[in-house]
Amino acid sequence: MTENTPGTSAPERFDPATADTRWQRVWDEKQSFRADDSSTKPRSYVLEMFPYPSGRIHIGHVRNYTMGDVLARYKRMRGFEVLHPMGWDAFGMPAENAAMEKGVHPGGWTRDNIANMKAQLKRLGFALDWSREIATCEPEYYGQEQALFLDLYAAGLVYRKESTVNWDPVDMTVLANEQVIDGRGWRSGALVEKRKLNQWFLKITDFADELLEGLSTLDKWPEKVRVMQENWIGKSQGLQFRFDLSNGETVEVYTTRPDTIFGASFVAVAPDHPIAQGVAAINCEAANFIALCKKGGTTAAELETAEKLGFDTGIGARHPLTGKYLPVYIANFVLMEYGTGAIMAVPGHDQRDFDFATKYALPILRVVAADAADADKPFAGEAEAGDGVLVNSGFLDGMNVADAKAAVIVRAESEGWGEGKTVWRLRDWGVSRQRYWGTPIPFIHCEVCGVVPVPKKHLPVTLPEDVSFDVPGNPLDRHPTWKHVDCPQCGHPARRETDTLDTFVDSSWYFLRFASQPEDRPFDPEEIKRWLPVEQYIGGIEHAILHLLYARFWTRALARIGKVEVTEPFGSLFTQGMVTHETYERRNPENGQPIFFSPGEVERTGEGATLKVDGAPVEIGRVIKMSKSKKNVVDPDEIVAKYGADAIRWFMLSDSPPERDLPWSEAGIEGCARFVQRLWRLFGQYDAAATGEDKALDRKAHQTVHAVASDIEALGFNKAVARIYELTGAVEKAAPSASRSDAIRKLLLLVAPMMPHLAEEAYARFGSSLIADAAWPEVDPALLVDDEVIVAVQVKGKLRDTLTVAKGTPKEDLERLALASEKVQRALEGAEVKKVIVVPDRLVNLVA
């Protein structure tokens, strides 16, 4: 920076509209944020989860991308070669829904939305490398995905089988268990049905141990996310054993609590278990019950909370230790996909079994108690799942739970009726989807050769453009020509696979394509080695299981087949909070239902609010997540147009810790806009010719630079904002001096990652370079240590005065200064000081 001259004097007010447009154009022209693969600088890969192109950026996106942008800009200032890309998770059902509702092609609808959202992102001034932009709906991307899918197939990690699936009868597609919410499709809301279809699967279960053990290395991930993945993978160790049945058959069950085997009072099988199906074949009531079960929830979480229903098959299961016969039920809460599809039910020590036994008047036996004397203690209306000692359990009596588990497994294995076994909750990933707008699965079905992979030289298998969405279902299946093709092996007429890949496949490797984009292969392994893992990944907690687990699996699968060396894609993960807003509503006088109004329709009046059109009051509701249905949304474009990009960026970083929800406030954004102007005025006071020293301000400035750097690196943006406010106030109060001008310069550099347009506009008055290319201010380590400290003085435990003294002042001097204080003497009221406790540099406590 050079001295401000009359020729470079600043206008009185900062004009966001002009500055935003100017500097965004300059950054584009100079390609300021394009990552250089040939750079020798240390590398930093900052990535926010890429959005689905719905057509509009919402305020939650702004918060997410602002956080990543601040970190990316900061890393550039610290000398890193930064990769900060953006793209579009562009396949999926909403585009097909739009095609059906509006008569537009999914591709055109999606690309128009991308153009709109890209323009919105640019207006916010994000330091993105647009040269690496990808859209998963483009053949350049999904063709490489098809190649990777074939590589995994060749390695035995992709297979096809008939399986029971969750079928959405409205969207007419298969849903993963995670996409079924309360028994309904996550997009359509339709009740999900069970069907059997031939499906393509990825063998994620081959990586269950790796994925579980790998969580222990992710110490920069939120504990909550790691626990969620651990539970989803669901490793359990227990006993698998056989019950001999009264009809001459046997049933295998799996239990994680073999210690409670003497407490079993019934056996339950899943509705689609072979025993259940056999009973249904000869019993209409059983068949009707199974049909009823298929209409209910399909996930473990849903079945856990649903009413427990059962059907007595009339079959008995002989207990392997007591010889008694237990009734066998078909139960709606047993999943065929977990364990063996049959369970040993112990009502006394499992709440689900307790509820079922209570409903059907089955015995509830106590086999674990806090003390042996409690063997006959009745249950207090619920199961007891805690630890204790074994009771009413024959040879297990008196053992603790762990020893009893081991003893039962030893007994079962020695007598040949069971064996210890590890079971996983995780299931192979079904990736077939019966829809058009997705990546075509690159296989051909030939009556002579069977299932044949498409040769890589014929990739990409592209989607046909001439499709119709007049009726639900998969247009690819109905297409008159696209699916008809000659077999690449024998030349006979064959047909293409008409299923497309689950869109979560697209987002399971996009971070690799951002890092390297050769035309002839998915990526260059050497570039992946240099850029990966992503240093900082930012996105919502809602992706803890689906996207994040699948991305971890995909990376490990590619590592196993030698495509990459990295095994964990994201070194550090941050899950940001939502942006929330109060609702405004009235009750419909006819039906009592709420009628919601947008913030723009409402006028706030003190503690209340009125509707602008009629002046009548509206009810101010709770502060909740912004949603279109509640109309409590704020349009980022309107905010940028009114206040400028820097004001909304600053608001997103202020007040709330970034992992917590951020309540939107009109007063808050107005305050941010005022602070932008306040800084502008302060930057205009820089004077390179100023002389004189202000040691306290020097120390404050250097300490703030150091602290803000630490805050940004820890993603503690609200703390960084608070420190910048403090330094701003200190500089404003300081008299003109060289120290003050230096502090102004440092302050300008500090806000550059957060308010880049304001910073560029101010920086331009002092030279020709961009602040986007400037270095982070240096700090003097000697100034990071305070020479003076404030020591609290207490009398009888209450604060009465403070002493500002040199650091390291001896105890005797602190005691003398404390006793000399007039405030202390007044507090003592002439009483004799019996004891003085001194904590150097912190506290003097006088006991009278």
Swiss-Prot record:
Q: What is its EC number?
A: 6.1.1.4
GO CC annotation, single: cytosol
Q: Domain of life, per the record?
A: Bacteria
Q: Which intervals of this chain are the motif 'KMSKS' region?
A: 625-629
Subcellular location(s) of the protein: Cytoplasm
Ranges for region Disordered: 1-21
What is its EC class? ligase
Q: Give the residues the record marks as binding ATP.
A: K628
Q: Which PROSITE patterns would you find in this protein's record?
A: AA_TRNA_LIGASE_I (PS00178)
Q: Which keywords appear in this protein's UniProt record, sorted alphabetically?
A: Aminoacyl-tRNA synthetase, ATP-binding, Cytoplasm, Ligase, Nucleotide-binding, Protein biosynthesis
- Which terms under GO biological process does the entry name? leucyl-tRNA aminoacylation
Q: List GO molecular-function terms, semicolon-separated.
A: aminoacyl-tRNA deacylase activity; ATP binding; leucine-tRNA ligase activity
Catalytic reaction(s) noted: tRNA(Leu) + L-leucine + ATP = L-leucyl-tRNA(Leu) + AMP + diphosphate
Entry-linked InterPro entries: aa-tRNA-synth_I_CS, aa-tRNA-synth_Ia, Leu-tRNA-ligase, Leu_tRNA-synth_edit, M/V/L/I-tRNA-synth_anticd-bd, Methionyl/Leucyl_tRNA_Synth, Rossmann-like_a/b/a_fold, tRNAsynth_Ia_anticodon-bd
Per UniProt, the short sequence motif 'HIGH' region occupies residue numbers: 51-61
Family matches, as NCBIfam families: leuS_bact
Record family assignment: Belongs to the class-I aminoacyl-tRNA synthetase family.
State what protein this is by name. Leucine--tRNA ligase
Native species of this protein?
Novosphingobium aromaticivorans (strain ATCC 700278 / DSM 12444 / CCUG 56034 / CIP 105152 / NBRC 16084 / F199)
